[in-house]
Amino acid sequence: MHDYFGGWFKLEQEVARQLRILRRGVAEIVPEEDLQAKLRKSLATGKPLKVKLGLDPTAPDIHLGHTVVLQKLRQFQELGHQVIIIIGDFTGRIGDPTGKSETRRQLTEAEILANAETYKEQIFKVLDPEQTRVTFNSHWLGKLTFAEVIELAARTTVARMLERDDFARRFQENRPISIHEFFYPLMQGYDSVALAADVELGGTDQKFNLLMGRHLQREYGQEPQVAMMMPILPGLDGVQKMSKSLGNYIGIKESPREMYGKTMSLPDELMLTYYELVTAVPLEELAAIRQGLASGSLHPRDAKMRLAREIVAMYHTPEAALEAEREFRQVFQQHDLPDDMPELTIKEDRVWLPRLMVQAGLAPSTSEARRLIRQGAVKIDGERVTDPDTEVEVREGQVLQAGKRKFARLHTF
């Protein structure tokens, strides 16, 4: 009897420990009591949970915002559970309509497969490849007969589909909704049926699709999955969600210097959010950082520098993080120039500044260069230039700077 209660107590302790780790940073768990029950059953039987994440490979470059769910998957892996990444090569032909105000262009098969390879290369910067199963949903969706598709469609209603905000909005505004778009949440939900998933992860904007998975599993006689929704990561501006198109992002393929510098530009009030969602800093240390910032015993600058080191080390190496910090101190705290900067040889004696910036790789276009100049973000040998019509008299060793982190040294021909 003592052994029985001792074993039960240890099991409940482990369930509580795993729940505490898995709750970190989560916006919503539907329902949490099911997750607790699934963890208990997994520990009692020794059978790991199947934890699913679907990736629709429409945008191949991953930024920190995408890694929020990947970090949660990594936690599941470290607790001994099975992670399944579904590359949505079949659903990607539709494109997820979530949050979209109009019908999206369908990707070609070649585009999808190329993007999928890029995704796979990047997700393993966070996930353990040895503990990750990667599969494509065309393996089962592509084999459904038309009769089976009709049967799948019969498992829900148009009224239910119109509960989604984006569909409801488009319907009310008389914007077109293609029938095939209704199939996206159905197909994502059917992925959960095909895999008999125990848990599915997604952003808060994916809640409808994740709950569709629960609904369809129940319809097909399976135990419904738990839906875990992660917050949408705010961008570096602290206003809108992190997005490449908005320019407020940190890409996980960026250089250590760029990654470190961008992190240091983060508003102080977002530091703890980033610590919680995109680093692996233990909960106890996170609590100490929070307490230190609240009491004033930890300077926000020092907390942010550690955050920058953590992020750079995760996607590069600890040594690269320390080197990026050294350069940051050198350039931005001591106002020195970086040791390593792009060099450019110029044949002309005088060059229009916006064109020179494009040649030096400091701006993607002359119009963007003109905007940066007007904003006062451009310096020549440390002197700010605000006239976009400036003609630069090129001198040997001249240093051109755009923003806080981009430099180029000029040489004469």
From Swiss-Prot:
Alphabetical list of Pfam families matching this protein: S4, tRNA-synt_1b
Record's catalysed reaction(s): tRNA(Tyr) + L-tyrosine + ATP = L-tyrosyl-tRNA(Tyr) + AMP + diphosphate + H(+)
Residue span, S4 RNA-binding domain: 351-412
Annotated coiled-coil segments of the chain: none
Task of the protein: Catalyzes the attachment of tyrosine to tRNA(Tyr) in a two-step reaction: tyrosine is first activated by ATP to form Tyr-AMP and then transferred to the acceptor end of tRNA(Tyr).
UniProt-listed Enzyme Commission number(s): 6.1.1.1
Motif interval(s): 'HIGH' region: 57-66
Top-level EC class: ligase
Spans through the membrane: none
GO BP of this protein: tyrosyl-tRNA aminoacylation
PROSITE patterns: AA_TRNA_LIGASE_I (PS00178), S4 (PS50889)
Primary localization class, coarse: cytoplasm
InterPro entries: aa-tRNA-synth_I_CS, aa-tRNA-synth_Ic, Rossmann-like_a/b/a_fold, S4_RNA-bd, S4_RNA-bd_sf, Tyr-tRNA-ligase, Tyr-tRNA-ligase_bac-type, Tyr-tRNA-ligase_bac_2
Family: Belongs to the class-I aminoacyl-tRNA synthetase family. TyrS type 2 subfamily.
Protein name from the UniProt record: Tyrosine--tRNA ligase
Motif window: 'KMSKS' region: 241-245
Complex formation: Homodimer.
Gene Ontology molecular-function annotations: ATP binding; RNA binding; tyrosine-tRNA ligase activity
One cellular-component annotation, GO: cytosol
NCBIfam families referenced in this protein's UniProt entry, alphabetically: tyrS (TIGR00234)
Subcellular location: Cytoplasm
SMART domains noted in UniProt: S4
Gene3D superfamilies in UniProt: HUPs, RNA-binding S4 domain, Tyrosyl-Transfer RNA Synthetase
Domain of life: Bacteria
